[in-house]
Swiss-Prot record:
Residues making up the signal peptide according to the UniProt record: 1-23
Gene coding for it: Mal-A2
Family: Belongs to the glycosyl hydrolase 13 family.
Glycosylation sites per record: N30, N124, N198, N312
Source species, domain of life: Eukaryota
Residues the UniProt record annotates as site (Transition state stabilizer): D364
GO annotation, biological process: carbohydrate metabolic process
GO molecular function: alpha-1,4-glucosidase activity
Annotated protein name in UniProt: Maltase A2
Database matches in PANTHER family: ALPHA-AMYLASE FAMILY MEMBER, MALTASE A2-RELATED
Gene3D superfamilies documented for this protein: Glycosidases, Oligo-1,6-glucosidase, Domain 2
Length: 567
């Protein structure tokens, strides 16, 4: 039997927008979300680094390609030890990106276009240059335990003081660092320059609610919460911190994977915190009106944990605990592999909560063209936009951008830079990203081929396929995904994925995706005649062509098509 799912790809077609039989859905449930890495989207002042004015100038593009909301990677004041994920002032914009006035202008323009703005919210830690940390080091009143501090353990053999536990940071090495001035260890789940805030302290939680309110008052539509699993740690009743057991996954005790992080990830208090923040946002909406404010949770956690973050029978949590399952697909993945990845989410999240979201990529992961191959970029875009729920696209994936080899210089090498290179707008100087003489990261050598301007003029380009997919989101068939039988998905062969979206009355879309490198012959898929409405570059079919699915059809290698049936 076919499994859940189905979303479509629409090309330039007339879509039925009647909503017969569709359930009420909130805006985020069927949204097209788009991540912008601000340093790399658009430079407005010629310094080679993207900024807020640049983003504002390009918001019309997001409207053009059908984006519902965009979330911005951190733009707050920061020494940039971790490119903005080390925040020294949660209430201001880093001068690299502009000013609060620039941000307000961006909000005004976004609202005029109907594009929602979501901010990256980094609550787990701050920069060690944040005034909160400086006050905590000095034990100033109210800030003494604003961060996680401990005396450590006395080594009976050496007489020296050792860290409180064997915990290892995400970036390797001890999670505890000695502060000479305070004469205590502080905790940092990430870099040493990113000390962890102490969320067991009510004052910390109040400060973070104040941060949320500050940006809500400026007009943002929600927050993507960074590093959710790391917010709380377990502490024993006697105040000590337990050692974590060895995982068996590695041989280097300084590597993060060496231990099983049962005391430093996904603690029960983190779930309660998500419920607290959701209640805060819902109350804000009740008092101020407008659409729902949304919470996205970045959590590389089990689906059972993500289910808890979403909510239970008595509490609501993050609307979109981010689903990274499709990011684990490779160039060798078959249609059956894709179904397995979909099932992992749907067997829990859809069954329990009737919710789904699908992430294509992000600033920490190689681009689709590198993970799966350039010939499969359109296939993944088709899949994530054909499945029920929200889709999350990393900037540039809609035009098939690839990683760039970035040479290590100086005393550091950021191995995530390859997927963070400037957006490719045109084939001109610096891809029209910047008027400067250089850009903060090098452009792809392929930018003259893969860019927005060029792809606008190619009917089956990745960009136009992407735009066609977004058009289908307003069709009655796509809006019926919460109705019984509104979608299904299955691997009809080892390599061919089929997704169906239907309102069960007057409209049905059938999406076929050939993940393999060989032709696929399909016989008797349905006793009806359909019409092709979208076909990728590898297809021999064209929009408007009829297809009798009671007969045989053939899919070329790496071909994806969308067919429509109307009563």
């Amino acid at each position: 039997m076919p499994k859940w799912a189905h979303l479509g790809l629409a090309a330039l077609l007339l879509i039925s927008t009647t909503q017969e039989g569709t359930a009420d859905i909130d805006w985020w449930e069927n949204a097209s979300l788009y991540q912008i890495y601000p340093r790399s989207f658009q430079d407005s002042d010629g310094d080679g680094i993207g900024d807020l004015k640049g983003i504002t100038s390009r918001l019309g593009y997001l409207k053009e390609i059908g984006i519902t909301a965009t979330w911005l990677s951190p733009i707050f004041t920061s020494p940039m030890s971790d490119f903005g994920y080390d925040i020294s002032n949660f209430y201001d914009i880093d001068p690299i990106f502009g000013t609060l006035e620039d941000f307000d202008d961006l909000i005004v323009e976004a609202k005029s276009l109907g594009v929602k703005i979501i901010l990256d919210f980094v609550p787990n830690h701050s920069s060690d240059e944040n005034v909160w940390f400086e006050k905590s080091v000095n034990r100033e009143d109210g800030y003494d335990d604003f961060y996680v501090w401990d005396d450590g353990k006395l080594n009976e053999e050496t007489g020296a003081r050792d860290p409180p536990s064997n915990w290892v940071s995400v970036f390797s090495g001890p999670m505890w660092t000695w502060n000479e001035k305070r004469q205590q260890y502080f905790l940092h789940q990430f870099q040493v320059k990113q000390p962890d805030l102490n969320f067991t302290n009510p004052m910390v939680r109040e400060h973070m609610l104040d941060v949320l309110k500050f940006w809500l008052d400026r007009g943002v539509d929600g927050f993507r919460i960074d590093a959710v699993p790391h917010i709380y740690e377990h502490r024993n009743a006697d105040g000590s911190y337990p050692d974590e057991p060895v995982s068996g996954w590695g041989s280097d005790p300084n590597a993060y994977d060496y231990h099983d992080h049962i005391y430093t990830k996904d603690q029960p208090a983190t779930v309660d915190l998500m419920y607290e923040w959701r209640e805060f946002l819902d109350n804000y909406r009740a008092q101020n009106g407008g659409d729902s404010r949304v919470l996205l949770a970045e959590a590389y956690s089990s689906v059972e944990t993500l289910s808890a973050y979403f909510g239970n029978s008595t509490h609501q949590g993050t609307q979109l605990p981010m689903n990274f399952q499709l990011m684990y697909l490779s160039g060798y993945s078959t249609a059956k592999d894709v179904v397995g990845s979909i099932d992992y989410w749907m067997n829990t999240m859809w069954k329990e909560h009737q919710t789904a979201n699908w992430v294509v990529g992000n600033h920490d992961t190689n681009r689709v063209a590198d993970r799966m191959g350039a010939h499969k970029v359109d296939l993944l875009n088709v899949i994530v936009n054909a499945l029920p729920g929200a889709s999350v696209t990393y900037y540039g994936e809609e035009i098939g951008m690839s990683n760039v080899d970035v040479e290590c210089t100086g005393d550091s090498c950021e191995d995530r830079d390859g997927e963070r290179t400037p957006m490719q707008w045109t084939a001109g100087k610096n891809a029209d990203f910047s008027d400067g003489e250089s850009t903060w990261l090098p452009l792809s050598p392929e930018y003259q081929r893969y860019n927005v301007q060029t792809e606008r003029g190619v009917s089956r380009s990745s960009l136009n396929i992407f735009k066609g997919l977004q058009e289908l989101k307003s069709s009655s068939a796509f809006l019926a995904f919460k109705e019984d039988g509104g979608f299904s998905y299955e691997a009809v062969t080892e390599q061919v994925l089929q997704i169906i979206r239907t309102n069960k009355i007057s409209e049905e879309y059938r999406i076929l995706v050939n993940m393999g490198n060989g032709m696929e012959i399909l016989d008797g898929l349905a006793p009806k005649t359909y019409e092709y409405v979208l076909a990728t570059a590898y297809s021999t079919h064209y929009s408007g062509q009829k297809a009798d699915l009671s007969q045989r059809i053939i899919l070329m290698p790496y071909e994806a098509v969308v067919l429509r049936w109307l009563a």
